[in-house]
Amino acid sequence: MNPMTRRHTWTRLACALSLGVAAFAAQADEGALYGPQAPKGSAFVRAYNAGNSELDVSVGSTSLNDVAPLGSSDFKFLPPGSYTAQVGQQSLPVKLDPDSYYTLVSQPGGKPQLVAEPPFKNKQKALVRVQNLSGSKLTLKTADGKTDVVKDVGPQSHGDREINPVKVNLALFDGSKKVSDLKPVTLARGEVVCLYVTGSGGKLAPVWVKRPVKAD
């Protein structure tokens, strides 16, 4: 190899190395910005606190701390499998399946529950979900009671409805009886908004649960 060819070869190698380092640095910066991506087949879990004081939750070594009253954490990913979940002062065994989403719910005076959250993949519409953890059959309607949105959701079950993005005023009904008017909620494309209903008898507590908005 003559000196000129050797020089060109080293120049190309140096350029390739510098580009590789730059690409690695860009990926590192992107990782720092967006956080680690979930490995394929992960399970996802969040916490909803139906109580009146802050709540700490853990699943295995994954922590969901300082969950505000009537608030929720964001989802965190972890390997699928069997774990012990610690919800405040109570614990329960949980089994998390691959590519599945769950909410750990803490209820005042009751045992914590693991609630499955079927994933939603329609990016053009929003999904309204009623997670009914009460003992009554419930219906989500427009605030005037004239139109059913999610009808006849049985105790300890959920009901879904895909709708166009909109800001709406809704109410929860037990048969023809209005249980509660709900806070106005804005539904965005590709978003799942859950109405969690806890409590029993005449003391039902419906609360909208959305993924927290992250600050820039």
Swiss-Prot record:
Cellular compartments annotated: Periplasm
Pfam families: AlgF
Main location: periplasm
Cellular component, GO, one term: periplasmic space
Signal peptide start and end residues: 1-28
Pathway note: Glycan biosynthesis; alginate biosynthesis
Keywords annotated in UniProt: Alginate biosynthesis, Periplasm, Signal
InterPro entries: AlgF
Claim: Signal is one of the keywords in the record: yes
GO biological process, one term: alginic acid acetylation
Functional description taken from the UniProt entry: Together with AlgI and AlgJ, forms an inner membrane complex which probably interacts with the alginate polymerization-transport complex and adds acetyl groups at the O-2 and O-3 positions of mannuronate residues. Acetylation of alginate is important for the architecture of biofilms and increases resistance to opsonic killing in the host.
Similarity remark: Belongs to the AlgF family.
Name of the protein this chain belongs to: Alginate biosynthesis protein AlgF
